[in-house]
């Protein structure tokens, strides 16, 4: 008997019998050849299915409707003879829930707003030279991640980017950009190369529904955590969203340009939910892809009205297929999972194993947010912080323990952290240095599982947070010397800690959103990178640049095994000072035989005694590039500047 209620459908979908009858691991989507194209759709509850063909991605009448043939395992298929390159299509499906039109869940490109899927020949769409694009080899010691939205990166009129490319994929391809084209102060890709960051994490670049691609973008803005088509690049980031091949080509051009600069690309992926409950997956197989409560209603652990059921076999297959597609076809270097706590541990470990099978796949980064956006009906082990020791050691998490210890809680603007003088937080600073490998609070397999950070796109920027803790009515545009020192100290802590350092784009030039803690659909002007600040706060930019280089010169800070954290020697200093020593690993090419690091969160100078031997001053609270030159050699007692991270190298 056919189920009648959502609860009965839930029982069916989670039964072993349904899995046996419908699990399918053959090809899905459009399989193109010049001689013809196979279309295959997994829709086991459908009673009828047809494909509608169009010449254009938007507008224009349907030029033909053809029935699909039902195959085994819930698959419907049709063969379209002849060269179908450039054709668009959707499906008409009749299920127990009614009749509707749906795009292809496995579509690789689409027309405006992702309504119609596109058939195309990759060889005719790929940019010139794409076959020569390779992922840059980035050793652990050099790894650092800079997070940005495609839109924010170049929307500023002063970015020096061509007007037509601002806020687009192609902005990343323009060489030699400078502030207002002054020829002096680098911006965009030119700036990133000078900064020395090794990965750019791109906020969602697959097709999302919160920006209307058919309308001008001047007053539209969204971060894009509202997925519509998981395997299709976002059209508003292309120069022509009406032509499906353009978004594919220009996305690849962006990736190739970053790779050409030696920078890896991390893709922010949002499989945990879809933009609306009425979406392509729910139209093709109603209810199957989304987690349900016991009464059959949709679980809402995402806070967006639905959550992806990663534990259901064909949903799991879909997620893994999609990630592997981006890794293979777009040469993506890493994946950041939004609300990773909504996925089950088994799925994430299976995905890691599949990525590892790809050429160079073991170097593809994989990490995520180890929490949820609400109560979830997931009854298996969640891929969250509590189950970190169940995840593969090369699946990392954003460490909110480190974030909150350094700068204070993210939900209370006035709550201070270590850099603002919060008593007692120094214990967590020590744990952060060792990537929590020596703490009972959070036992990772290895330091590589910990993302050390203080700011990301969510919540207040670091600069805004520092000012809001200090002042009841902060002047966000002002140059505040105390906040600058605290900013340098915060960076000095997480960039000398073990784990993978990560920061929000513009943190290094005091990025402000004027106290707005959730700017996901605020104005483009509020969200965009203000490239004038990169020049105004050039000394802060240089401080980050120096720390990035210093970290690379001492490879053990980026070590992936637990031997590094175990080798850290903490000094018995008076609170709230933190000091530690780490010997270099034999044969790793370190510039110094050991590092000695001190953090002083007080607003007065402090005197400490160095361990025995001679120590070169590498970085203090003002400059992080002393290590590049012949700075002074210290022994015995030394003075720590107020609000400073001070680093010495043993010589």
Predicted features along the sequence, with ranges:
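The feature marks proteins involved in alpha-glucan
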Residues: 1-34, 38, 70-174
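Carbohydrate-binding surface patches
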Residues: 31-47, 567-609
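Beta-strand-rich binding/interaction modules
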Residues: 41, 47-58, 62, 605-622
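C-terminal beta-strand-rich structural cap/linker in extracellular carbohydrate-active enzymes
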Residues: 43, 85-89, 630-651
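Conserved alpha/beta catalytic core and glycan-binding cleft of carbohydrate-active enzymes
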Residues: 120, 352-353, 357-509, 516-520, ...
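Substrate-binding/active-site clefts of carbohydrate-active enzymes
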Residues: 151-330, 339-359, 365, 377
């Amino acid at each position: 008997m056919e189920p009648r209620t959502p609860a009965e459908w839930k029982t069916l979908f989670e039964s072993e019998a349904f899995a046996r009858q419908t699990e399918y691991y053959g090809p899905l989507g459009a399989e193109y050849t010049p001689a013809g194209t196979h279309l295959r759709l997994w829709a086991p509850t459908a009673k009828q299915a047809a494909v509608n063909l169009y010449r254009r991605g938007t507008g224009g009448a349907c030029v033909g409707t053809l029935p699909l043939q039902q195959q085994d395992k819930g698959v419907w298929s049709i063969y379209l003879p002849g060269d179908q390159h450039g054709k668009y299509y959707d499906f008409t499906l009749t299920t127990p829930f009614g009749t509707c039109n749906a795009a292809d869940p496995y579509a690789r490109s689409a027309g405006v707003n992702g309504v119609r899927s596109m058939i195309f020949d990759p060889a005719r769409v790929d940019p010139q030279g794409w076959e020569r694009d390779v992922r840059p080899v980035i050793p652990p010691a050099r790894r650092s991640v800079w997070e940005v939205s495609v839109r924010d990166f170049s929307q500023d009129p002063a970015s020096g980017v061509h007007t037509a490319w601002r806020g687009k994929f192609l902005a990343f391809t323009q060489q030699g950009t400078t502030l207002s084209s002054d020829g002096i102060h680098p911006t965009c890709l030119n700036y990133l190369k000078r900064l020395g960051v090794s990965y750019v994490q791109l906020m969602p670049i697959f097709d999302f529904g919160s920006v209307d691609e058919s309308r001008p973008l001047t007053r539209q803005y969204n971060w894009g955590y509202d997925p519509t088509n998981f395997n299709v690049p976002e059209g508003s980031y292309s120069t022509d969203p009406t032509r499906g091949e353009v978004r594919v080509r220009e996305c690849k051009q962006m990736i190739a340009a970053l790779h050409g600069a030696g920078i890896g690309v991390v893709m922010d992926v949002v499989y945990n939910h879809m933009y609306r409950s009425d979406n392509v997956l729910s139209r093709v197989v109603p209810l199957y892809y989304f987690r349900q409560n016991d009464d059959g209603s949709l679980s809402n652990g995402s806070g967006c009205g639905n959550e992806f059921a990663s534990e259901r076999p064909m949903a799991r297959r879909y997620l893994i297929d999609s990630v592997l597609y981006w890794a293979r076809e777009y040469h993506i270097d890493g994946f950041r999972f939004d609300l990773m706590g909504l996925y089950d541990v088994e799925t994430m470990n299976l995905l890691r194993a599949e990525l590892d099978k790809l050429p160079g796949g073991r170097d593809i980064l994989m990490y995520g947010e180890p929490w949820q956006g609400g109560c979830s009906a997931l009854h298996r082990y969640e891929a969250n912080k509590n189950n970190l020791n169940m995840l593969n050691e090369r699946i990392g998490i954003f460490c909110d323990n480190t974030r909150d210890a350094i700068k204070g809680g993210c939900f209370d603007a006035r709550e201070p952290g270590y850099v603002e003088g919060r008593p007692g937080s120094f214990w967590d600073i020590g744990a952060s240095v060792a990537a929590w490998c020596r703490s009972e609070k959070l036992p990772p397999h290895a330091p590589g599982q910990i993302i050390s950070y203080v700011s990301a796109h969510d919540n207040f920027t670091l600069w805004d947070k520092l000012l809001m803790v200090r002042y009841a009515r902060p002047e966000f545009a002002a140059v505040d010397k105390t906040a600058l020192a605290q900013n340098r100290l915060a960076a000095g802590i997480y960039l000398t800690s073990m784990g993978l350092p990560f920061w929000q784009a513009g943190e290094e030039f005091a990025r402000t959103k004027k106290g707005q803690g959730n700017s996901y659909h605020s104005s483009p002007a509020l969200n965009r990178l203000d490239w004038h600040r990169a020049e105004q706060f050039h000394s802060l930019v240089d401080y980050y640049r120096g720390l990035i280089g210093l970290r690379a010169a001492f490879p053990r800070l980026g070590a992936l095994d637990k031997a590094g954290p175990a080798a850290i020697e903490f000094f018995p200093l008076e609170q709230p000072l933190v000091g530690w020593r780490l010997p270099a690993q034999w044969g790793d090419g370190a510039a110094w035989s050991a590092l000695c690091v001190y953090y002083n969160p007080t607003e007065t100078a402090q005197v400490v005694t160095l361990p025995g031997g001679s120590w070169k001053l590498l970085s203090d609270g003002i400059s992080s590039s002393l290590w590049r030159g012949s700075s002074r050699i210290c022994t015995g007692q030394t003075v720590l500047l107020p609000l400073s991270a001070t680093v010495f190298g043993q010589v």
